[in-house]
């Protein structure tokens, strides 16, 4: 099994951070490798929202990585599952208030089956890199105008 997590302290309130991460259309603003993304069905910010996402894979080939929001608790938690593509991890964003800031933790979990278990080390490394992109998310959110 591959597991990775990372956390940052963002100088914004929990609802500002939550509203940003629950909208999958914001992903290209902070995650690298996203070629395209659109809301396929459901409502942005709600459980059941399904996003069609294409990533840049090895050699620049497109890779499907569609995902569905499985839990959306305002100001507290967003969970998702990848429903298309070669790897289908589950993940979540977990928020907690610290003074006037928000601690955001991003966790990914993937249980490869069959021959994919042979790639566990590569998958683990990729997931570690993915969650570490929270540093860019922090910079993007903190660059937004603070709400009054």
For the regions a protein language model found, what residue spans apply to each?
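Beta-strand/loop substructures that line and gate deep hydrophobic ligand-binding cavities in soluble
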Residues: 81-132, 137
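A generic structural signal for beta-strand entry/edge sites
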Residues: 3, 48, 75-77, 99-103
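Short, surface-exposed coil-to-beta transition loops
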Residues: 3-5, 62-66, 87-92
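Structural motif
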Residues: 11, 72-74, 98
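Hydrophobic ligand-binding cavity/cleft-lining segments
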Residues: 1-46, 148
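Glycine-rich portal/gate segments that line the openings of hydrophobic small-molecule binding cavities
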Residues: 38-84, 135-148
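Short, intrinsically disordered, mixed-charge
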Residues: 19-26, 124, 128, 139-143
């Amino acid at each position: 099994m591959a597991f990775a997590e990372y956390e940052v302290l963002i100088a914004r309130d929990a609802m500002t951070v939550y509203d940003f991460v629950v909208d999958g259309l914001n992903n290209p603003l902070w995650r690298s490798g996203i070629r395209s993304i659109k809301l396929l069905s459901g409502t942005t910010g709600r459980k059941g929202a399904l996003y069609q996402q294409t990533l840049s894979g090895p050699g620049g080939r497109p890779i499907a990585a569609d995902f569905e929001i499985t839990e959306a608790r305002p100001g507290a938690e967003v969970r998702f599952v990848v429903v298309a593509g070669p790897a289908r991890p589950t993940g979540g964003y977990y928020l907690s208030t610290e003074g006037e800031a928000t601690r955001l933790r991003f966790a990914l979990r993937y249980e490869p089956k069959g021959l994919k278990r042979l790639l566990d080390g590569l998958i683990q490394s990729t997931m570690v890199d993915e969650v570490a992109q929270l540093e860019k998310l922090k910079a993007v959110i903190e660059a937004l105008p603070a709400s009054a």
